[in-house]
Amino acid sequence: KSEMNKQKFFPIDLIIVNFYPFEKTLINSKRREKIIENIDIGGPAMVRSAAKNFKNVTIITNKDDYKKFIDELERNNGKTTLKFREIMSSKAFGLTSYYDSVIADWFNKNLKIKFPEKKTIYGKKFQNLRYGENPHQKSSIYVSDLNNDDMGLKKISGKDLSYNNYNDIFSGLDILSSIKKVPTTVIIKHANPCGVSSNKSPVISFKNAFVSDPISAFGGVVSCNFKINKSIANEINKTFFEVILATDFDINALKILKRKKNLRIIKISNSKKTDTPTIKLFDRGFLLQDKDNIVFNKKDLKFVTKSKPTKKEIKEIEFAMNVCKFVKS
């Protein structure tokens, strides 16, 4: 400080920093050297020091805050308030924490370390939701897949998705990922399958899934690993559903489905299975385990009875085993 006074330097009261694009590099490059080169060192150090000194310094780390910063200056005679600086400081520490977590996760995956000594859960806010599982609970959804900013889902029509919608959607997608490439329909209610069917005919696949439990299916979420056509759309519209997901929809199907204005119509843009671990949170910590990605195969069956099942029965056993692991009691 004495040297600054001697040189008649003004104190720095504004820092604006953009980090090296580590995430983008991870997505676009497999070269280890290039990835490591894009680990920012000076940027995070500068941001942390400025954020710690929020009493005197404004730190901006997100371009979405540039306009807020300008508005703040205009409202306060060219200055920022302590509250604004503290909010920006909070965002800055959130960014450095997120940035370091992505880097640590990359190292752990490369070193095949599944259960590191220190573990952080990270993500980018995708959307604020109207409420959580119940109306009195506040909620947001976060994206942690670097390759899918839209979570692999493209909304075509309908209301915004709710907390319960998302919970049911990803439960359905998990089941679809365990089924072979036969046209399959999954109907989910309260994160539980109430109807699952595979058939060479997509329309029969939907009908069979629905008749499994038509009462529970009411107000559920339908997930299909095939393109929805006019005939399937007509069947769907006979019942009230919250959400319809499919790999695609033809023009005539969309015209029919859009008659129900509140129906959420979602195109599955990416259903690739990931090795993301399963996390269960509780008050004092969380449980972490490998995701149960094993697909049951009839080759794993051992028959210990004299009477052997038929080929049809074996096929049904295989199907049932791949579905029942998703049922929650």
Give, region by region, the residue ranges found by the protein language model.
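Active-site loop-to-helix "anion-binding N-cap" substructures in soluble metabolic enzymes
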Residues: 1-111, 226, 280, 288
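ATP-dependent carboxylate/acyl-activation modules
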Residues: 13-17, 99-101, 109-329
